[in-house]
């Protein structure tokens, strides 16, 4: 997938060395944008194999508004394990903010879809996971922050906006912090899929997914992995098929998604910076 590989090359060639919260160190740039026309195929990185099951279940978990990793673990998804407390709690993370903003019963997803159906020309179709009132105390552990009703980890993909033109729905995501090797391929696929889901339930066609970054970085312990990806020839994009019978965003189940024609190079392991 050219857009992703271009991002990797740009950061390697233009990034500056920076320290970070985890102590790992990064090569980083500030401000970058990728665009994906969803009519050209589903944007799944092919220079390494991605775990689609984790991507789908995480998105469904967000839409449920849940803050406990039990659902993820029941479905074999471990991507949030490192940040949860002993009871599996993460604090009021993404899904909670999407569905019950600041515990004020503001369902941003429901309001978004209602606006898309009633006033698709609105410039107010935004959803935010960034809530300053629940950001963690950096001097405390993940579990201590959760116990204090804070998030274990601040949202990396902070907010997104939808736009309708000529019957096509596009989504722009602002990601304040982006782990290019491990996180970004997941984020691309997740928000592309989310855009397709929203488009279907609003009787629209999927348009573009635009991915805008703040701090986009490659961790120092991922340089070998991204070099390996750059040495591999990208394969054609697959096609994502959604169950056309689903008309409510909250009715989607794992079985309603089918990825056709996904061919990729082998998986590449990389340590998560916690």
From Swiss-Prot:
Signal peptide: none annotated. Keywords: Cytoplasm, Methyltransferase, Nucleotide biosynthesis, Transferase. (6R)-5,10-methylene-5,6,7,8-tetrahydrofolate binds at residues 51, 179, 273. Its EC number is 2.1.1.45. DUMP binds at residues 21, 123-124, 176-179, 187, 217-219. The keyword Methyltransferase applies. It is found in: Cytoplasm. GO terms for cellular component: cytosol. The active site is at 156 (nucleophile). Homodimer. HAMAP family: Thymidy_synth_bact. This is Thymidylate synthase. It comes from Flavobacterium psychrophilum (strain ATCC 49511 / DSM 21280 / CIP 103535 / JIP02/86).
